[in-house]
Amino acid sequence: MLKPESYACGQWIAPGADAQTIIGPVSAQPIAQAGGAALDFGAMLDWARAHGGPALRAMTFHQRAKMLKALAGYLDARKEELYAINPLTGATRRDGWVDIDGGIGTMFLFAAKGRREMPDGHVYIDGEVEQLGRKGGFLGQHIAVPLQGAAVHINAFNFPVWGMLEKLAPALLAGVPCIVKPATQTCYLTEACFRMIIESGLLPDGAVQLVIGRTGDLLDRLGAQDAVAFTGSADTALLLRGNQNLLRHSVRFTSEQDSLNAAILGPDADAGGPEFDLFVTEAVTEITTKAGQKCTAMRRLIVPQARLDDVAQALSARLAEVTVGDPADAAMRMGALASHAARDDVLDRLARLKAEARVLCGDTAPDLPGAFLNPTLLTCDDPDAASAVHEIEAFGPVATLLPCRDTAHAAQLANASGGSLVASLFTKDAGVARDVTLASAAHHGRLYIMNRTAAPEATGHGSPLPHMIHGGPGRAGGGEELGGIRGVLHYMQRTAIQGSPDMLSAITETWIKGSAEVTGPDHPFQRTFREIAIGETIHTPARTVTLEDIEHFARFTGDTFYAHMDDEAARANPFFPGRVAHGYLLLSFAAGLFVQPDPGPVLANTGLNALSFQKPVSPGDSIAVRLTCKRKTARTDSYGEVAWNATLTNQEGAQVAEYELLTMVAYDRA
């Protein structure tokens, strides 16, 4: 008998006398006892705020990203222990891959994005500096900093590992401690993964805590610096969202709810063609994976009226071949629902759907003691007059075919559910894809457009990717999670800071034009990453650009554009006073002015960003460069990236060009 424990204030707490007995969905026998312990939720929040939050916020974004990478690697090394428990939830090995490997992969992804896309500091910069005064002495900048409370994560039963890790990763990267509350039915698998997290020793005390069982008065104790992220049913979300304490303190509440997701077969998809076959294959996958218990599963299959019979026959034949039984048996394609209560709920909702739709296949169950149900396909002859098919979700291996007249009608039907997490379109016609997108994008959190070109690399209709947002409008909850760094920002406060360039530079750890320049003891290209200071600047001598320079560059490169070679034609151009120097010639001369050629800590020039030209340079003009260290970002164990602001001015002091130069610089001297 499994006895998953809560983890609060650094201590494991066993189930209490009122623990709930969990009946196995496969064996129909008791497999675990969970909950019932008297947890002190006030103490848990205090522990998170006093210990976990300060420890996490003391780390830079990159340090937290490295922590996540190490944790993901630790979990990956022990994942077979989780796969051993996985069948108890009713899930097959294939189902478990989505949950276990998918969750670990999500953590790896956030670790990588944190290193690549966030600064190696404590303040996230959101957007460009805004000049608020005429002379540049008063500026504005949007920043984001971690919330100083705790994140409460209330997760669903269907993905006990992924559901936890996909919320933990962005919150911990943001620097916010978390209290995890898994669904009781599958909490033993969540607890096994959570126990590994604690055993890794990689997170600071108070960074994560676990609630097995009821949340008691936890939500009543939250404040404006806290956040709630919920995944589950629309009914439960409505109940939680209405908590008076959450409303009173405007506590952030993100909800990802079940939704009646649609898949559209394009009018160009002929029976037996690639797009038709892809539609059928993905529909079968969505109906059967996790026994249909996915918030992103296809529930409404919208097909042209002329293709309805072809699709019905193809799907019915494929679904009839699906083997249903003990998920530990590799021969079984589909396992059980997560509980007998979940199966009963599906059967109840299926009965209500049958008032508007006919059963084409399924609506039966294997002769087994567990919570099994055969995949079921319905068809609704008049989806315009129907309401249940657009409102009632049977959260299991059930989908309904809906015939449509044309593309506009298909989009109308897809939108009829009041908002969804994802809608799919199977077409090779770009015009159809654009029409459906314009008609439907506002109603769905994600549009998955599939055809023969994308299929070899596609991840599937029902797979939320950590790079992309997961959420949707209306019935889907109106929230978002994941989406790369967007998901991290849900746990941060965006603040507008205003002040002088020096103040903003100090806050953001980034040199801002107008802030103080620093003069180093020698050329910065001869100094290591650690030695270079933010704001360190050199001013180069000037170089005169001659007509011979321009003509030689034109012949040498082949760039004989008339503005460089034909004075009369150039004067007819509203941008040029006559022949002018090539922009790339100016960049080359600039490099010649500021580069220190001897071997040193600078390893490579790896990029150039935000290049712009403000004023043409004519023969006889001179240019000089101001090169300033703008920011520094650690990249590997041996070198980091230094971003330089390069500003080119002419003999009159007027700016002619500006760009950001990226160099990789060694931490130490060779």
Task: Name these PLM-found stretches.
Residues 1-136, 321:
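N-terminal Rossmann-like NAD(P)+-binding subdomain of aldehyde/semialdehyde dehydrogenases
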Residues 26-33, 200-205, 224-225, 306, ...:
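Conserved C-terminal structural/oligomerization subdomain of aldehyde/semialdehyde dehydrogenase
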Residues 30-37, 53-57, 131-132, 152-153, ...:
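Short, well-ordered beta-strand elements within core beta-sheets of diverse protein domains
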Residues 118-277, 404, 457:
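Rossmann-like NAD(P) dinucleotide-binding subdomain of oxidoreductase/dehydrogenase enzymes
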Residues 196-201, 227, 235-384, 404-408, ...:
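ALDH superfamily catalytic-core signature
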Residues 521-581, 667:
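Catalytic strand-loop segment that frames the active site of acyl-thioester-processing enzymes
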Residues 524-534, 613, 617-670:
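HotDog/MaoC-like acyl-thioester-processing domains
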Residues 572-581, 585-630:
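Hydrophobic beta-strand-centered segment that forms part of the acyl-chain substrate-binding groove
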